[in-house]
Amino acid sequence: MENREGGSQIKIVVSDQLALGTYANFASIVHNFAEFIIDFGRIVPGRDEVQVVSRVVMTPVHLKQLLRALTENVAIYERNFGEIADGPQGGPVARTM
């Protein structure tokens, strides 16, 4: 369960179709005034294209909340398991346009 502002809780429901998740080793991020668009994709060695597997569109406010949650969770992960090594700058894992 997740806590909402004010202390109430919401139940997170994941359908069977989404339960296994989707693998991505690439992300492309674009934005305008009203929204951020994140395309998650898969790069296959030997191919010169990225297959987009999911597109997520978020408001700037929600994206900033996600950024905060990711930052907090990476810090917790690194406390428990050690520092995550950075990949090469401009590599396939994250790309901002």
Task: Tell where the protein language model's regions lie, with residue ranges.
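N-terminal intrinsically disordered, cationic/polar leader segments
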Residues: 1-61, 65-97
